[in-house]
């Protein structure tokens, strides 16, 4: 059994990272899940949320937006729509987006077409604020 996982994260725009890591935690569509070396093969979907990985005693966080995770032979491939590391999140912009989404949601009902889009925008903003607020490595 390998002692490390090879983590690869890719968006449509770029390769976000390639790292040898000790474990990952991801926001699965059915709930948060973790992967350690020797994990059973897996293919699952991701939702908007906080993705983390640990290298030694350091934990790194990213805000991810929808995607897929494939685990096979101590390799974790993450394909996501967007992924932002802590140091690439503009906290003021994320807070402004949160305010806009909250204000717009107060004007809408669940029957409105835009309602679910605004809920998703709210969730993305909240995750970005959470990840940015980590204040460096965990």
Curated annotation (Swiss-Prot):
It holds the Pfam family ATP-synt_DE. Coiled coil: none annotated. It comes from the Bacteria. It is a peripheral membrane protein. The keyword Ion transport applies. The keyword Endoplasmic reticulum does not apply. GO terms for cellular component: plasma membrane; proton-transporting ATP synthase complex. One of its GO terms (molecular function) is proton-transporting ATP synthase activity, rotational mechanism. CDD domains: F1-ATPase_delta. Keywords: ATP synthesis, Cell inner membrane, Cell membrane, CF(1), Hydrogen ion transport, Ion transport, Membrane, Transport. Belongs to the ATPase epsilon chain family. Produces ATP from ADP in the presence of a proton gradient across the membrane. PANTHER family: ATP SYNTHASE DELTA/EPSILON CHAIN (PTHR13822), ATP SYNTHASE EPSILON CHAIN, CHLOROPLASTIC (PTHR13822:SF10). This is ATP synthase epsilon chain 1. It comes from Syntrophotalea carbinolica (strain DSM 2380 / NBRC 103641 / GraBd1). The gene is atpC1.
């Amino acid at each position: 059994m390998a002692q490390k996982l090879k983590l690869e994260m890719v968006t449509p725009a770029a390769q976000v990272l390639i790292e040898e890591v000790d474990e990952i935690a991801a926001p699965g569509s059915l709930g948060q899940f973790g992967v350690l070396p020797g994990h059973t093969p897996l293919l699952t979907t991701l939702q908007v949320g906080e993705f983390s990985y640990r290298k030694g005693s350091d934990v790194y966080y990213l805000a991810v937006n929808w995607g897929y995770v494939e685990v096979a032979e101590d390799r974790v491939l993450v394909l996501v729509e967007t992924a932002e590391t802590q140091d690439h999140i503009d906290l003021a912009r994320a807070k402004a987006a949160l305010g806009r989404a909250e204000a717009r949601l107060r004007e809408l009902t669940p029957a409105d077409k835009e309602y679910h889009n605004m809920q998703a925008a709210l969730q993305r903003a909240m995750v970005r604020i959470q990840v940015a607020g980590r204040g460096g490595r965990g």
